[in-house]
Amino acid sequence: MGKIIAIANQKGGVGKTTTSVNLAASLGVLEKKVLLIDADPQANASSGLGIDVESVEIGSYQVLEHSATPEEATVSCSAPNVSVIPAHIELVAIEIELVDKENREYMLKTALESVKDKYDYILIDCAPSLGLLTLNALTAADSVVIPIQCEYFALEGLGKLLNTIKSVQKIHNPNLDIEGLLLTMYDSRLRLSNQVVEEVQKHFNDMVFETVIQRNIKLSEAPSFGESIINYDATSKGATNYLNLAEEIIKKNQ
């Protein structure tokens, strides 16, 4: 049975989509069968894997409102062993449309029942908010990866996210685990970067991944070519970091 991992942080610009795309691609390279669900209306995970989002007719929007199955919405992408349920700009409207539905927090969980056994990992790239979209992802997930950038105000909003996770555990999904806190955009030359790493490790100990994602120009270039970092430059620091993260997650889940 596949493990469902949500990549979530309501703070924007922390490396959430970068992590979703490159963790998916790295798991694929390590011969795991992966489904990436783009649950962010910005659709950057979809375009970051070479999918033309303008031409998406069936995607995560239809899966969430149960007008299409995950199988119908799944497309292939530029990364080996990775399939994608892409997003479309109309996903913006889903929160309003779901608000009157019974069991609205369980729409994604219910939809994924049919594909759970077909993949080793199902990753969900969450929107930078704590709305109904993210709530659906956390209710459907077995665990959550929380990217935290090594910059000023890094921990801002983290308490709020952890409280949301606690309330999801209490009300909707008692089995939800924290897979790990992932430090991103680390620059060893900066004192601030090192201070953030120290502070996060001191506060959260074992919850923090050993792998740290370094700031890397290739990582920021890759999405504009519709490629993961592995495809774009397999020798880059970014590729090494995300392969290490994938190995760490596989090892943890053996």
Regions found by a protein language model. Give the residues of each.
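P-loop NTP-binding core
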Residues: 1-254
